[in-house]
C-alpha cells in the first residue's frame, strides 16, 4: 500500500533516482519522473504507441466509470422502489468510484505521461488522499453489506437496518476512512528534485518523519494492506460462504416462498461477484506493492513504471465493473437503467421485482413461520 517516501540525493545518478507512489490507492508509479536524457534510459511508457494505449485505457475507464456510477446513483435517487438499504450501500460504492474516476485518474494519467507533477502543491496533497479515501470507503462498505446480509440470513433476524441508520453507517464509513487516509495528505512533499546539474523536475512524493528511509512509511503501508484489504476480504469471504451454505441447504415450503428464496440467491450471487471483482482487480497492485515494501530493489527494474501502470489500470477497472454487474445480474437495476435511458418513470415494472408489495410481505411472513426470516430490503435490491 503506502511505500516509504524517498528524496533524491545529490550524488545519485539518473538511473538511481526514484520517486514514490501515492500510497494506498496508488495513483502514480514510483518510476523515474524525469525525461531521461540518454536513449538507453528510456522506459516503455515513453514510447508513442505505449502512450496511446495508456491514454485509451485510462480514458475508457473514466468514461465508463462516470456514466455507469452516475447512472447507479441516479436510479437509486429517482425510483422510490429502489431506495432500499442495500441499494443505499451500493450507491455509496458508486460515489466512491465516481470520486476516483473524476478526481484521481485524470491527474494520474497526466503525471504518468508528463513524468513530473504539474498540478501544483494543493492537488499534490489532495489527489492521493482522495483515492486512498475512496478505496477505503469501498472496502468498508462491501464489508458492511456482507455483515448485514449474514446477520439477516444466517441468524434469521427480522429487524433490518433502518434507512436512517444506513445513512449513519455510510457517514461513519467516510469518517473512519478519512482518518485512516489522512497520512497520505499530511506526509506529502511537493518539491524540486535535481536530476542532473541544471536540470530539475517537480516531484510529489511521500515524506515521512525521521530519516530518509523512514520505517513509518513501511509500517503504514503494511498496516493498511492488512486492515483495509486482507482482513475485510477475510470477513467478507467467511460471511458469504456461510450465507451461501444457508441458502443452499434451505428448503422452501411453497412456490411463492421459493420465488422469494431464489431472489435472495440471485442478490447474494451478484454481491459476491462485486466483491470478487474488487478483490481480484486490486490483488496484482497490492502484491506488487508488497514486493516493493519487502525488497526496495524492485524499484530498479527497468520496466518498473510500466508494470506499475498496467497493475494500476487493472485495479481501476473495478471502478466501472460494478454497474455492468448490476445490469447483467439484477433485473431491478436492468429495468431501472432502461427506464432512465428512456426518460420514463416505470415504477410499476420495477416494483414488481422488489419486495415492497403485499406479495413480498406475505413471503416474509412465510419465512418467519419456517424460521428462515430475512429483511425484505436486505435480501432484495
Curated annotation (Swiss-Prot):
This is Neuropeptide Y receptor type 2. Receptor for neuropeptide Y and peptide YY. It is a multi-pass membrane protein. Residues 1-37 are annotated as: Disordered. One of its GO terms (cellular component) is plasma membrane. The keyword Transmembrane helix applies. Residues 1-52, 109-125, 188-217, 291-305 are extracellular. Keywords: Cell membrane, Disulfide bond, G-protein coupled receptor, Glycoprotein, Lipoprotein, Membrane, Palmitate, Receptor, Transducer, Transmembrane, Transmembrane helix. Disulfide bonds join 124-204. It is found in: Cell membrane. Glycans are attached at residue 11. Belongs to the G-protein coupled receptor 1 family. Residues 74-87, 147-166, 239-269, 327-381 are cytoplasmic. PROSITE patterns: G_PROTEIN_RECEP_F1_1, G_PROTEIN_RECEP_F1_2. GO terms for molecular function: neuropeptide Y receptor activity. It comes from the Eukaryota. A lipid is attached at residue 343 (S-palmitoyl cysteine). The chain crosses the membrane at residues 53-73, 88-108, 126-146, 167-187, 218-238, 270-290, 306-326. It comes from Cavia porcellus.
Amino acid at each position: 500500500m503506502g511505500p516509504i517516501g524517498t528524496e533524491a540525493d545529490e550524488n545519485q545518478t539518473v538511473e538511481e533516482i526514484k520517486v514514490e507512489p501515492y500510497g494506498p490507492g496508488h495513483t502514480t508509479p514510483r518510476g523515474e519522473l524525469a525525461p531521461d536524457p540518454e536513449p538507453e534510459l528510456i522506459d516503455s511508457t515513453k514510447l508513442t504507441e505505449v502512450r496511446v494505449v495508456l491514454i485509451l485505457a485510462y480514458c475508457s475507464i473514466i468514461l465508463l466509470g462516470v456514466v455507469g456510477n452516475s447512472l447507479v446513483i441516479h436510479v437509486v435517487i429517482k425510483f422510490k422502489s429502489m431506495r432500499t438499504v442495500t441499494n443505499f450501500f451500493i450507491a455509496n460504492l458508486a460515489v466512491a468510484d465516481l470520486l476516483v474516476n473524476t478526481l484521481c485518474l485524470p491527474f494520474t494519467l497526466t503525471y504518468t505521461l508528463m513524468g513530473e507533477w504539474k498540478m501544483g502543491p494543493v492537488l499534490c496533497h489532495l489527489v492521493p488522499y482522495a483515492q486512498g479515501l475512496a478505496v477505503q470507503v469501498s472496502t468498508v462498505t462491501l464489508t458492511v453489506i456482507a455483515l448485514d446480509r449474514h446477520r439477516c440470513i444466517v441468524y434469521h433476524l427480522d429487524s433490518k437496518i433502518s434507512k436512517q441508520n444506513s445513512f449513519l453507517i455510510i457517514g461513519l464509513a467516510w469518517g473512519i476512512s478519512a482518518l485512516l487516509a489522512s497520512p497520505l495528505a499530511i506526509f506529502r512533499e511537493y518539491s524540486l528534485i535535481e536530476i542532473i546539474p541544471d536540470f530539475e523536475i517537480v516531484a510529489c512524493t511521500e515524506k515521512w518523519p525521521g530519516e530518509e528511509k523512514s520505517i513509518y512509511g513501511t509500517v503504514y503501508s503494511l498496516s493498511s494492506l492488512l486492515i483495509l484489504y486482507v482482513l475485510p476480504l477475510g470477513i467478507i469471504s467467511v460471511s458469504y460462504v456461510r450465507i451461501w451454505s444457508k441458502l443452499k441447504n434451505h428448503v422452501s415450503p411453497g412456490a411463492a416462498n421459493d420465488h422469494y428464496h431464489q431472489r435472495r440467491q440471485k442478490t447474494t450471487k451478484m454481491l459476491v461477484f462485486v466483491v470478487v471483482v474488487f478483490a481480484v482487480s486490486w490483488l496484482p497492485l497490492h502484491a506488487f506493492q508488497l514486493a516493493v515494501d519487502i525488497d526496495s530493489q524492485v524499484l530498479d527494474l527497468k520496466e518498473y513504471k510500466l508494470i506499475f501502470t498496467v497493475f494500476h489500470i487493472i485495479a481501476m477497472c473495478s471502478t466501472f465493473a460494478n454497474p455492468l454487474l448490476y445490469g447483467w445480474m439484477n433485473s431491478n437495476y436492468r429495468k431501472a437503467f432502461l427506464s432512465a435511458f428512456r426518460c420514463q418513470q416505470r415504477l410499476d415494472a420495477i416494483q414488481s421485482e422488489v419486495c415492497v408489495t403485499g406479495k413480498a410481505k406475505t413471503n416474509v411472513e412465510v419465512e418467519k413461520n419456517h424460521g428462515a426470516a430475512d429483511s425484505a430490503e436486505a435480501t432484495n435490491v
